[in-house]
Amino acid sequence: MHGENEVVVLRLGHRPGRDNRMTTHVGLTARALGADRVSIAGAASDSKATIEDITDRFGGPFEVELTTEPRALVRDWAGTVVHLTMYGQRIQDVEADIREAHASGPVLIVVGAEKVPFDVYEQADYNVGVTNQPHSEVAGLAVFLDRLFEGRQLDREWENADRRVVPKETGKRVEPVDEE
């Protein structure tokens, strides 16, 4: 999140045609809930374009990149690596340690699509489970980011937005942002 050590989400194992919507939602969730960047492994140019379009319209900063070497990103990461998996340690048991690690350096969050190679489990500093039950990787990422930032990301100011959502009790309203 802007003003803190970098948080990057790595979408590992994107399968074209099968994972387009889910990969897009991983990126949009990362953006909305405080990450600085998403790196997508695989041929996901449609997801990249959609996430960039939302960032252009609703603000950032947020970066999207495609990578052909995701395992090198994990291996060479100069910070804490967190792998979200239902088999990991309970989030409530490790979240304070991860927040402490984030206070002193960047965090890479690995979110798998297909079966994650075992070396990712071994290279991760933390394998973290959100409920240790099968569910959506998007839900796991959202809960993890909220726990990492302790809700601070919900009050974030969006830079360079063309439009903004106006909160309403009922109905919906999106309005242009006036540059002053």
UniProtKB/Swiss-Prot annotation:
Q: What keywords are assigned to this protein?
A: Cytoplasm, Methyltransferase, S-adenosyl-L-methionine, Transferase, tRNA processing
- UniProt main location, coarse: cytoplasm
Entry's localization field = Cytoplasm
Under catalytic activity, the entry for this protein gives: cytidine(56) in tRNA + S-adenosyl-L-methionine = 2'-O-methylcytidine(56) in tRNA + S-adenosyl-L-homocysteine + H(+)
Determine the domain of life of the protein's source. Archaea
A biological process term (GO) from this entry: tRNA nucleoside ribose methylation
Say which enzyme class the record assigns. Answer: transferase
Q: Name one Pfam family in it.
A: Trm56
Gene3D superfamilies with a match to the protein in the record: 3.40.1280.10
Give binding positions for S-adenosyl-L-methionine. Answer: L84, G112, A113, E114, K115, V116
EC assignment: the record states 2.1.1.206
**HAMAP family per UniProt:** tRNA_methyltr_aTrm56
Its quaternary organisation is: Homodimer.
Q: Which family does it belong to?
A: Belongs to the aTrm56 family.
Function description: Specifically catalyzes the AdoMet-dependent 2'-O-ribose methylation of cytidine at position 56 in tRNAs.
The name this protein goes by in its record:
tRNA (cytidine(56)-2'-O)-methyltransferase
